[in-house]
Amino acid sequence: MFSKILVANRGEIAVRVMRACRELGIKTVGVYSSADKRAFHRVYADECYYIGKADPRDSYLNIDRIIEVAKKSGAEAIHPGYGFLAENAEFAERCEEEGIVFIGPSPEVIRIAGSKVRSRESMQRAGVPVIPGSPKIDTVDEAKEWAEKIGYPVAVKASGGGGGIGIVVVNSQEELEEAFRKSKKLGESYFKDSTVYLEKYLARPRHIEVQILADQHGNVIHLGERECSIQRRHQKLIEEAPSPALNEEMREELGKLAVKGAREIGYTNAGTFEFLYENGNFYFLEINSRLQVEHTITEVVTGIDIVKYQIRIAYGEELRHGQEDVAIRGHAIECRINAEDPVNFYPRSGRILHYRSPGGIGIRVDSGIHMGYRIPEEYDSMISKLIAYGETREEAIARMKRALYEYIIEGVETNIPFHFAVLNDEEFVRGNIHTKFVEERNIAEKVKEYLRIFRPIKARLDEIFMESEFTWEEISAIVTAIDAYEQELERGIEERIWQAIFSLGA
């Protein structure tokens, strides 16, 4: 086994990988930018090195500097986490050239996965259904021809795109020329790839993905699916496993499609095959050639540590599980806790003044933040992941709602009220979700109602907790008031909460 691994990332995912290393007895090397001098991953690592300024191009995307640190520290392998260099074929190649193991798939597989056109072609060869669409399109006239074949509405997509960047929905031929040019421009600007193609636009699909593990000895298994339909602007916010839309037969069918696709391209390590599901049909969407943010919920329902498996596979070990050993038990939900305005989703930065994470049975928190930490504006707004497990979906929802009540993050706005609004929506509870759920269910207006109740109560509680001394009677009264707040808020009985809180000052 490796004796030392460098984690080329920051925040909660850096801590997550380091935890797996610690359990395997592997020393860890961390890296940090000027914005992360007081970040938790810096002190959690066995050794940590400064790699540059806050701008990611000077630090977490600086291949030369990261390789330099790996060689200086004696790290035998690099785990890229997600984001930054995780799906960068050039970085994976550079690691190979320097004699450092890249914990992930091969550079060629990363290139296939990173090209929507190439990955679609690979899945078609494997017999995996894809959304009706075109090969790469070079001219507007070609685009018009294919759009007529496919049928409007169509989506013009940048081949190298991700996170919704480079996707333009077109409802008629009159809109196509501008959309074609816009998508090509976005692809070139963001991904240095101006290749575009067309797909039939699915208006209200479910977004379902399959986690796979593949070793270097030809063994490939799947760990079931995750539903990621609760999104805003193509960014996932709530994920769950398993999907409430699938039965066992459908689950097995989808898993086999993902395994077939992985074998077609020679995939190794952990990966995710994403699909859209509409009207009883699965359509391949894309491959994520890295560890997913939401890998946690698969770990919870299978009991399999995906990060440890990444490390073991990269070292050359065979899978310890066959497909028959994988069982889905219970239900798990993940809420991404972001530092952002919960209504318009604009990111927020600032110092965390008070922090208390939730706990209790069935709750997991993956976080890289702490009280006093300043959330930098240079990076993604996600600051932690809250995971709830239950024997049933209903129990998982109940535990998540309870954990959200307990989660205290002060100093910056977060999207916790957004999660309250979604989890209390009757259609979400019924499992009737799709990628347009947030817009169609008018979640933003429901969030505003939660904020109307939260803000004055929170201000009064802050005032109480700023007092320098408490008697035991006052502490007891505060706990009683908070209990009343949590229990009564959901029933909409606001007046009783106010009475309980204001009685403290009497």
UniProtKB/Swiss-Prot annotation:
<keyword id="KW-0312">Gluconeogenesis</keyword>
<keyword id="KW-0436">Ligase</keyword>
<dbReference type="GO" id="GO:0006094">
    <property type="term" value="P:gluconeogenesis"/>
</dbReference>
<keyword id="KW-0511">Multifunctional enzyme</keyword>
<dbReference type="InterPro" id="IPR051602">
    <property type="entry name" value="ACC_Biotin_Carboxylase"/>
</dbReference>
<keyword id="KW-0479">Metal-binding</keyword>
<dbReference type="InterPro" id="IPR005479">
    <property type="entry name" value="CbamoylP_synth_lsu-like_ATP-bd"/>
</dbReference>
<dbReference type="InterPro" id="IPR011764">
    <property type="entry name" value="Biotin_carboxylation_dom"/>
</dbReference>
<comment type="subunit">
    <text>Heterooctamer of four A and four B subunits.</text>
</comment>
<keyword id="KW-0670">Pyruvate</keyword>
<feature type="binding site">
    <location>
        <position position="116"/>
    </location>
    <ligand>
        <name>ATP</name>
    </ligand>
</feature>
<dbReference type="GO" id="GO:0005524">
    <property type="term" value="F:ATP binding"/>
</dbReference>
<dbReference type="GO" id="GO:0046872">
    <property type="term" value="F:metal ion binding"/>
</dbReference>
<dbReference type="Pfam" id="PF02786">
    <property type="entry name" value="CPSase_L_D2"/>
</dbReference>
<comment type="pathway">
    <text>Carbohydrate biosynthesis; gluconeogenesis.</text>
</comment>
<dbReference type="InterPro" id="IPR004549">
    <property type="entry name" value="Acetyl_CoA_COase_biotin_COase"/>
</dbReference>
<dbReference type="GO" id="GO:0004736">
    <property type="term" value="F:pyruvate carboxylase activity"/>
</dbReference>
<dbReference type="InterPro" id="IPR005482">
    <property type="entry name" value="Biotin_COase_C"/>
</dbReference>
<feature type="active site">
    <location>
        <position position="290"/>
    </location>
</feature>
<feature type="binding site">
    <location>
        <position position="234"/>
    </location>
    <ligand>
        <name>ATP</name>
    </ligand>
</feature>
<protein>
    <recommendedName>
        <fullName>Pyruvate carboxylase subunit A</fullName>
        <ecNumber>6.4.1.1</ecNumber>
    </recommendedName>
</protein>
<dbReference type="InterPro" id="IPR016185">
    <property type="entry name" value="PreATP-grasp_dom_sf"/>
</dbReference>
<dbReference type="Pfam" id="PF02785">
    <property type="entry name" value="Biotin_carb_C"/>
</dbReference>
<comment type="function">
    <text>Pyruvate carboxylase catalyzes a 2-step reaction, involving the ATP-dependent carboxylation of the covalently attached biotin in the first step and the transfer of the carboxyl group to pyruvate in the second.</text>
</comment>
<keyword id="KW-0067">ATP-binding</keyword>
<feature type="binding site">
    <location>
        <position position="199"/>
    </location>
    <ligand>
        <name>ATP</name>
    </ligand>
</feature>
<feature type="domain" description="ATP-grasp">
    <location>
        <begin position="120"/>
        <end position="315"/>
    </location>
</feature>
<dbReference type="Pfam" id="PF00289">
    <property type="entry name" value="Biotin_carb_N"/>
</dbReference>
<dbReference type="InterPro" id="IPR011761">
    <property type="entry name" value="ATP-grasp"/>
</dbReference>
<feature type="domain" description="Biotin carboxylation">
    <location>
        <begin position="1"/>
        <end position="443"/>
    </location>
</feature>
<dbReference type="InterPro" id="IPR011054">
    <property type="entry name" value="Rudment_hybrid_motif"/>
</dbReference>
<keyword id="KW-0547">Nucleotide-binding</keyword>
<dbReference type="InterPro" id="IPR005481">
    <property type="entry name" value="BC-like_N"/>
</dbReference>
<keyword id="KW-0460">Magnesium</keyword>
